[in-house]
Amino acid sequence: MVVELKEYDSASEMAKALEDEISRTKSLLGEYLRRLDDIRSLAEKSKKIREVVMKLAGKKAVQETLGEITVGNLSVILDANPFHELTAIEDVVRSQQERLLALQKAREALKWMDQLGDTEGLKYIVVENDGVPEKILFKIY
């Protein structure tokens, strides 16, 4: 989570920055969704092959340990398989979807600013949390 202060000269400049962020997030989300489809397909194939081999070998599927170790606050997966990657991409997609929703809600909440008209002599200081506006300070200069 990154909190930043950004300064804008007009409501339209702030709206454009928000639109750009929404577009970037949509594009990124689209890329992740394509990867998710590819990995999901690979994970399903991997699962089917594993089930067939286990059945032919006459063995029961054993619950595997994830081969996961924790180093400080970092989780490290050793010998990652398609299921590990699928889980990681699902987490990223969920996060990007939540971010996109927050950006779109912020855009809706800021529509009233279009009616301000000429705001010469006014700066917009915006507190953003991961690129999502949370607070706007009007500063007269």
Regions found by a protein language model. Name each.
Residues M1-G30, I77:
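Short, charge-rich amphipathic alpha-helices with coiled-coil/heptad character
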Residues L28-T70:
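Extended alpha-helical coiled-coil "stalk/arm" regions
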Residues A61, T65-I89:
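Short, glycine/alanine-rich amphipathic alpha-helical segment
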Residues E21-L36, E85-V92:
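Short, charge-rich amphipathic segments
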Residues L42-V53, H84-K135, I140:
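Coiled-coil termination/hinge junctions
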Residues L18-T25, Y32, R50, L103-E108:
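Charged, low-complexity, helix-prone segments enriched in Lys/Glu/Asp/Gln
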Residues V2-K6, A17, S41-V52, L56-A57, ...:
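N-terminal secretory signal sequences
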